[in-house]
């Protein structure tokens, strides 16, 4: 069932979801087969269908889970500490005191384990308050994978349960990397995630650089126990579809994934399992940017949440709500503290650029005026 505006934007003091964000809910770009995200999703799914399920036990695929989840699903069930920075309203979209827009597809992990699923992928849109630039967007798409093992499997291999699960995990994901990138050099880097131990990130050498492909690890036993399988072991991984698609298809700006411009959409027509690796984005006319600076004094008692108590995520959210996808980048270009008055000044440069037409100073000035008014009213700053 489709979510309505009242399901996501509520008259609740904790709600920080804008109409701009709500309008992305239910778009489901990963469902579009002739779209870079849909193409990549299909390629990954094909790998797990044909390369992994060799013992007759296929992976289940879930790609239509509602993005509003309980706070416990998003954090507690994944063993994320109560004081973790990601719980801040500076980083997470809260619907009310009980629910959020999911920050990761891992929010459905325990739910699927409790339902008896032991091999599955979850795909969907996820939401995070973040900075604005060519590689960051408040809505993106993730894929979560889980595989559970019975004791008989590691006993037959004569291995310790953790070592067995880790070996199976790395073999599976190295195969996925080869499926996507070809015969590339790979390396494993130790990492930390609250819900896996040991944890690692897989990197591939592609296009002359090391690229982080995914994060993964052996699932923490507490999660399996809560899921009803204390005697079993499991691995889990997660990856961002946009991050990989930008590299594989040479897409330079993350906003392009949301474009309805036919010059973008027609480039992916006819994509299939035999030709998708040859597809590359062909740039069309890049219209000039319009730059606007905004300088302001921060209030002395500012509390913007998060570990750094930075205004940036809140400011970016507000600017995006006003300017939508015309906003290309928001960048802090100057910061100083005046010792005489004890105040700190920030100056941000906002880059506006349309993918489809030239912008006029008049229309951007109107957006900028609205933004300035809202910044004063909502963030309590003093414009300079």
Where would I find each of the regions flagged by the language model?
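A conserved active-site cap/scaffold subdomain adjacent to cofactor or substrate pockets
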Residues: 136-174, 178, 228-263
